Amino acid sequence: MFSSSLKLKTNPLMDNKIHRSSSDRDFRGSTISSVKCSLNNSEDLIVKVRERVKGKVEISPSAYDTAWVAMVPERDYSGQKPRFPECLDWIVENQNADGSWGVQSSSMLKHSLSCTLACLLPLRKWNVASPQLLRNGVEFIRSSSSAATDKNQISPIGFDIVFPMMIQYANDLNLELLLNQDLVNILFQNREAQLTRNKNLEYVAEGLGSSIDWNKVLMHQRSNGSLFNSPATTAAALIHRHDKKCLEYLNSLLSIYKTWVPTIHPMDVYARLCLVDHLQGLGVDRFVHPEIEVVLQETFRLWQQKDDKIFTDATCRAMAFRLLRMQGYHVTPDELGGYVDEESFFATVSFESSGTDTVLELYKASQVRLPEDDDTLEKLHDWTSKFLKQKLQSKTILDQQLERKVEFNLKNYHGILDAVKHRRNFDLYDIDHRRILKTAYRCPTVYNEDILLLTAQDLMTRQVQNQKELQIMERWLEDCRLDKVSGRNAVLVSYFLNANNFPDPRLSEARLAYAKTVTLITFLDDFFDHHGSREDSLLIMELINKWTEPLTVSYPSDEVEILYSALHATITDTAEKVYAVQGRCIKSLIIELWMEVLTAMLGEMDSCNADTPPDFDEYMAFAPKSLGCSLSILPSLHLMGETISEEMVTSLECFELDKHVSIAIRLLNDQQTFERERKERTTNSVTLLMDADQISEEEAVSRIQKLIEHHTKELLKLVVQKEGSVLPRKCKDIFWNTIKVGYCLYRFSDEFTSPQQMKEDMKLLFHDPVLKTTP
């Protein structure tokens, strides 16, 4: 498979005291011992992860938001007493040793400054703190104040607007901060620039004070009484305008969290979607599939109701769209129509949703396009991809983890192979991860030790299994004497590709059958193209068609004998394994599929030698079949633990799946190799279009790209559709994984010819330790 006319080189080989724990901080250093202790308790880990999916969403306290709630006055006492004194108690009890509040991190000093100044304000306003507590806080702000204008510091949303205003509040309260006046001037200049540049600033209205019409701000009030689900903004509104719903919202928070509030509430829907996304991205979703389905069903119900838990947050909306569509739920891109261009996006979304992480989610949503869609997702893809590329080029993504995610997704989205994605996501998974809104917060529901341990175990199990199976493949190669045949030894590459198609470690037989088939296709493709005569090629086809016993044949050459004997033995072995699990013989099906592939290879051979090349339609009638997609996939489907009937394999659905994946990969191949193949006088769809229609190379490549996109959309539609489908979804996913392989190999270069990235990915999967010992 993926082998026609290619030259394969030689194989290369917390935030705060309440939520802080030593196991969180020092986890990476103790990971190895933790995993070793858990190796025999995987079922316990699965139960814990299931509880994470079903249980309450956990979130860390926000010193910043708790401080704003603490500033709300009690109306019954003419505003001379705090409405929420318990928040004041929490502030007093949770100052860090260095005088700050909030996360202590050298890259998040702006966060610390914002939290610390916010906490000093209610302490000063209500005069409840000891002088030393205030002095320590003021000293921290003074000593760290230079970070307030440091562009290399990660900035909370609205910092440049809110922090200067809090300085003004401090002055009004006669709280002397001892800040350099030049620095203060710069901060207020930056604030004015932000106010001029940005629209939709209601999310950070606490930084606008009396300059904003709070009645207009309250027009953004949500059904739960909050403003943007932000305790700080809601508290600020309550300070400026008494509103019963705002008060009820804050009361509800304190009934839940008792003495503090988070920076966002509620966030159940978003957190659960993030959790599902992470579990899928780490490859451990199969352990909690029923629980994930419950989450998606509830999300779809909210989607249909246009619930504000989804639709008031662009990030959540985009993620919900992608996850639901990829699982076959009927969602249309109309709901993303407000974000079709950059101008519309920034004019539509609130300040909280205007960051790079939101644009990345929109970019990923734009990739799940179906044939019936209008141009919404294409327009969305155009501007989000340009925006993210510009962010990478300008090096303005200060969050290194987010930067790596953007780079990984932007490089070749459809070419991200599952097993590679799982491993790279694991390397990025950090149980101390903090998302930045107005303040940094942790969500242990999404980032936790249970998921990390379960994934580590799974990846180590996979790696051990992969190494064993590679040894089996090498022995098979030697037993079949294929190492004696001229051509590309594609064992390592073939196995790597199918390991990505079947990442579940239990699917050993499916992986091996697939890998052996791809390896044989590669050898035979080289034989037909370069090392054998037409007569020898026809002989191999005749022997397969008649299913002749290898020992009864008089062979014209050792290579013909080795190739046919290997084919006969491998087909027999695969058929026997399928019979053992399915109770029916598919040998005739495998032979038929081999004849189809070899006939297509012969057609390629003849087209290269013909005086008149085939036209485009004639070429596309045989060239996609020479890749052997159905030959590689269909036998393997019988070894995946699903009951596969003959009717399934011969269904129109299966035919269409094979057609679209084969055509798309053939065109991806041709698009990348046409310049070389034109010099070699090898038939290629790009050159056929150029010659037949007398069009430029650029126009031909553009037409081919549109065809690739068409067949990719059609394939995805078949994979995700539920109604009328006869193949199990697990089986249809193999066709989708296969097109990912095509994008991986041919989207930007011919990786069979220049396999540098593939070398790195193979090393990562097969050899690099899953857990790295920290010094």
Curated annotation (Swiss-Prot):
Mg(2+) 2 binds at residues 525, 529. Mg(2+) 1 binds at residues 525, 529. The Asp-Asp-Xaa-Xaa-Asp/Glu (DDXXD/E) motif is important for the catalytic activity, presumably through binding to Mg(2+). This is Isopimaradiene synthase. Its EC number is 4.2.3.-. GO terms for molecular function: magnesium ion binding; terpene synthase activity. Pathway: Secondary metabolite biosynthesis; terpenoid biosynthesis. Ubiquitous expression in roots, stems, leaves and flowers. Belongs to the terpene synthase family. The gene is KSL6.
